Amino acid sequence: MKEYYENKVAAVTGGASGIGLAVVEAMLEMGARAVTIADINEDNLNKHDSRLNAQYPGKVQGVKTDVTREMDVKAMVDAAAAFGGGRIDLLFNNAGLGLAGAFEDQGNKEWDKAFAVNFFSVIYGVRAALPYMKAQKGGHIANTASGIAFVHFPYQSMYAATKSAVLGLTDSLRFEYQDAGVRFSTIIPGTVATAIWDGGPIPDSAITPEESAAGILKGAAENKRVIFVTNDDREGALNMTLGALGHSILEPAIGEYLLGVARARRSGNFTAI
């Protein structure tokens, strides 16, 4: 796997914390030539830009990026390509929001923000990177979705909708651009102990950002269509698919399971999964 990342030019949105930062650090450890950290949190961005440049001189740059603004994303990708000598090999559209709550409590303003951060940011990144990758006849765009794109947990309809959209978009683009040499992968990163939980209780099954990043980068190097970092997510996707096809045992079991989650969350236990 190390050889895949040697001398690569990469950009990572949401790259100054959590999974994104772990992906940045792992690529640098494996010999990436130029890595752009894109993030809206300027304090985190400056801190990790300085720290990593001290460790990997001249191989890291931080670019403040609001992923809900297409001009910001394009400027970031252009800066990443310039930093890499006119090319970009890898784009990780990783920035996102964790979302939960009752459907009736969420208005159009909340839905607009959810899709702006979790979905349209991915479109903006793809649009900005494609011209470079098509011209160089190669590249890889990996978009972060979630296991909820397969297992649609109640009281997370907004999150399920946005991440399902990312999965569908990425899967379609993978085959649309395969002959142009551009790879697309959907990342299912697992339940990860990051700031996305915003001070709430973290499930016992959560893995570390570093563990998630290792699985992500292995899957990308192997050009996986869908990168399942954990077996839990892989099995959940399989069970939901078989259930939807009418599996006589799985379908009622899945229904009972998700109904149980709904009831637990309705009573205030949002770590119920």
Over which residues does each language-model region extend?
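Residue(s) in the substrate-gating loop at a strand-loop-helix junction
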Residues: 146
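Conserved glycine-rich Rossmann-like NAD(P)H-binding loop of the short-chain dehydrogenase/reductase
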Residues: 32-48
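Substrate-binding pocket helix/loop in short-chain dehydrogenase/reductase
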Residues: 102-103, 107-112
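SDR active-site lid
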Residues: 174-236, 242
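The beta1-alpha1 cofactor-binding region of Rossmann-like NAD(H)/NADP(H)-dependent oxidoreductases
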Residues: 42-43, 64-75, 108
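Canonical Rossmann dinucleotide-binding motif of NAD(H)/NADP(H)-dependent dehydrogenases/reductases
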Residues: 2-36
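Active-site helix of classical SDR
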Residues: 126, 162
